[in-house]
Amino acid sequence: MTTAPVPRLIRGLAVPTIISMLVTSFYVMADTYFVGKINTQSTAAVGISFSIMAIIQAFGFFCGHGSGNFISRRLGARDYRSAEKMAATGFFSAFLIGCAIALVGLLFLDPICRALGSTPTILPYAKTYLGIILLGAPFMASSLVLNNQMRFQGNAVYAMIGIIVGAVLNIGLDPLLIFVFDMGIAGAAWSTFISQVCSFTILLFHGPKRRKHPHSLPAFYSHSSLSERNRIRRKSFSLPSGTGQCLDYPI
């Protein structure tokens, strides 16, 4: 990245980044299109659940942008130890936050759906769809972290591929599960879940060849050795991204 021509470098990083950010919206678009052929209640259920999905994505961007920005700075300073610690911290933090969101969401699924505007006729569909979507919260949040960390290390193309594969798989699985297997709105939710796990797997297990720093539990546990100044920097990088994502899709 320090020797490549600037125009080519910008194109190589900007185009995959734009595509990756657009593709994250395809999950809801695909689900809305196909469940719209079932009934209006199913369409409303997907719309109601989108607010929760936006919150999950916000935490993914929060951890991903913050850790990725920090990693790129540490790599430039040749501080590989701190970069490795932050890579693990961002990844495992997002995964644990996703687990917490899933747990709380499933425990309070009924009141959450009602608070988001579910009517008595929409409520069963919303609970079915959102309940399955919440199971994928850890994978959705952490895959966004992996995507952002790889982009900040200059591997924007592979980061884009990992996200695109999941979106394309979702578009293919939606009609199969909804209509062929007659699973209805549950099929749309399971399609999204499977696709997100697929993206997560590609980025996690095939990414190390292109990612300079692995995500190891020892590095995560040693996060406490990061200086207070570095932890403050990480938060200052993270907050604008996470807050912006939430404000883009207000509840």
Predicted regions and their residues:
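Transmembrane helix-bundle signature of multi-pass secondary active exporters and lipid flippases
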Residues: T17-N69, I133-M140, I202, E228-I251
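Hydrophobic transmembrane alpha-helices of multi-pass small-molecule transporters
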Residues: I55-A58, N170-D174, S199-L204
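Helix-loop interface residues and adjacent transmembrane-helix termini in multi-pass membrane transporters
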Residues: F26-M29, K37-T40, R74-A77, F152-Q153, ...
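Small-residue-rich hydrophobic transmembrane alpha-helices
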Residues: T43-L103, M140-A159, I251
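Short alpha-helical transmembrane segments in multi-pass integral membrane proteins
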Residues: M1-T17, I71-P138, V180-S238
